Amino acid sequence: MSKKDTVTKAFMRENTVFADAFNYLIFNGKKVIQPERLQELDTTELVQLIAKGKNNKNESVQKYRDILKAAVIMEDENADYLLLGIENQTEIHYAMPVRNMIYDALQYGNQVAAIAAQNVKEKKAPTRAEFLSGFYKADKLRPVITLVLHFGADPWDGATSLHEMMDFPLEEMRTFIQDYKIHLIDPAALEPDELEKFSTSLREVLGCIKYSKDKEKLSSFIRNNTRMMLEINAARVIQAITNITLDLSEEVEEVVMCKAIDDMMQDSREEGKAEGRTEGILFALTGLVRDGVLSIKDAAFRANMTESAFEAAMKKI
């Protein structure tokens, strides 16, 4: 597992951040899912494919999710139970709809197998049809929602549905082929008002990723944000994804982002000055070559460049 994968997984595993992501996705930022009502589950999706007949053996299918939690959502005095999974993507996965569909199908398969085993244990009297499936008419599954969180500055350009991964020779076929859509949070696609719907440091993480390729916009986002004292896990994600240098020493529990931005902007100014000096030297040497005072070989030597690189630079001046 890469460093980016490790730090994003540790960050999103925190119940407060996990709940924040799903409250944005499902409830438009309203705090309905409570962190204290989340329970982490085994991320191994293992299901036994039950074979029919005496000589056929059961086969196992196994996959590993990033994060899976059980959630209890209280509405009035009623409790709704569901399973929530997050897939962290530091790179775009062009088969994500199929991947998520497999995870969800295996989870439902797990639930069917567990319910069937419980029915046998309780020695319930089934009908013939219920006996064959092990899953009784009155049994219910818990809903599963899987969220893809893209930790990248470039816009997600992969498919977001199974249908997008297919060609339909006959348009009439589309209606009869089941679609599967992914739920995606993509920093590049988030508008400023949407970032405000996040209530934890997930907002700062997504914002820093969104603006990471534009130093001026990144500086503005951080300076206009009142919550730029970030916990260490959030800061680790920002540094790993955006390459902003932060003080992540072990004794530090919170990181001040404004200082990092000041340092970044100062480095940018120094780089600009250095580039300006280099351009000035190249301009002068090019003039001397064109006036016949220096050979290309001598000018390239003075510029600490190869002759071919110097000739290429001359063409741009």
Language model: regions and residue ranges:
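Elongated, amphipathic alpha-helical interaction scaffolds
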Residues: 1-317
